[in-house]
Design a protein with these regions (language model features):
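Extended substrate-binding grooves/exosites of carbohydrate-active enzymes
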Residues: 1-174, 181-189
């Protein structure tokens, strides 16, 4: 998803009950993944640990119509009377969902319209280290989150960054070994 952020920020397999599942979205913090994959951060760590790894594989650069993982177990593509159909129906009934709005994948670096998702900037920070850049997420226009913890992540080609909110420094962070994003997880909005 592009521009969707869920709290608390958690990392894990999309097949588990992660925030956003009930509304068929994926958090733009990009810390979740399908059971057969990993996050970009995990993939890069393996590449950096094992320099003999020749490259990486990204499935896919663009979101696309079809394979709405983790929501591909919905009723739209299943034959009634099968175990898969019955399991999907039970899950949707528990969530009180009558229609499944999900029709596209969530894997892309760009969305269906070609707009850059937050993960675009994460990939750019790794793939183009010579290009000075920083991308801060999430957006910062949530009056309803006042007083609540709202983690801030920074994707940067630099080695470190300092986060300021309303002119006040929340400190500098330096990328550690096998760290590809800078995180301020205790920021209060």
């Amino acid at each position: 998803s592009r521009g969707e952020y869920f709290f608390p920020v958690v990392q894990g397999d999309l097949n588990n009950n992660l925030p956003g599942k009930g509304i068929f979205q994926i958090s733009s913090y990009d810390l979740s993944y399908p059971g057969w994959a990993t996050t970009p951060d995990q993939q890069w760590e393996m590449q950096d640990k094992y320099p003999g790894v020749f490259g990486e594989f990204v499935w896919t650069g663009f979101d696309y119509i079809g394979e709405p993982t983790p929501y591909g177990g919905d009723l739209t593509g299943l034959r009634p009377g099968t175990r898969a159909y019955d399991r999907a129906k039970e899950l949707l009934d528990r969530q009180n969902v009558t229609e499944v709005p999900s029709r596209s994948s969530y894997f892309g670096i760009l969305d269906l319209a070609g707009f850059k998702k937050d993960r675009f900037w994460l990939y750019q920070s790794k793939w183009r280290p010579e290009l000075p850049m920083a991308h801060i997420l999430p957006h910062w226009n949530w009056p309803e989150r006042k007083g609540q913890v709202t983690p801030v992540h920074v994707y940067t080609s630099g080695d470190e960054a300092e986060l300021f909110i309303n002119g006040k420094s929340l400190g500098k962070k330096k990328k550690g070994q096998f760290e590809y994003r800078l995180r301020w997880d205790d920021v209060v909005y």
